[in-house]
Amino acid sequence: MEMMIKKFCQRYRLPEKSLHELLSHMTEYHFGKGESIVKEGERNSNFYILKKGIWRAYYMIDGTESSLWFAGTGEIAFSSWGYVNNEVSQVNIESVNESIAYGIAKPDLEELFNSSIELSNFGRKIFEQIGRAHV
């Protein structure tokens, strides 16, 4: 857990106290190797922080999987289509190996953003990065 906290706080420049506040509102989930977290064509607006393991996002082209990104310990993962636009996901997100993640539903996370300037700034930075990536 300490490694995850250190990596997360370094990567996202969030004070440890604020991360602990966020984690206290999240649920711990366990996923098996190859297990789907988000399926293409389904709506999922949850926000995840990986405690352990590796996830990947991919889409299918003519029956072939094309990977978009990988996320590991201390990183975030979510369907930007589901979270940002409440649309169905254009990608699949799966657990590459046994993994543990903390998850929170969009309404609960937005409530936290409204209650903490540090968490609000964290959220703004994340979604600004996504906006730049989709331009």
Model-derived segments and spans:
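Cytosolic regulatory regions built on CNB/CRP/Popeye-like sensor folds
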Residues: 1-135
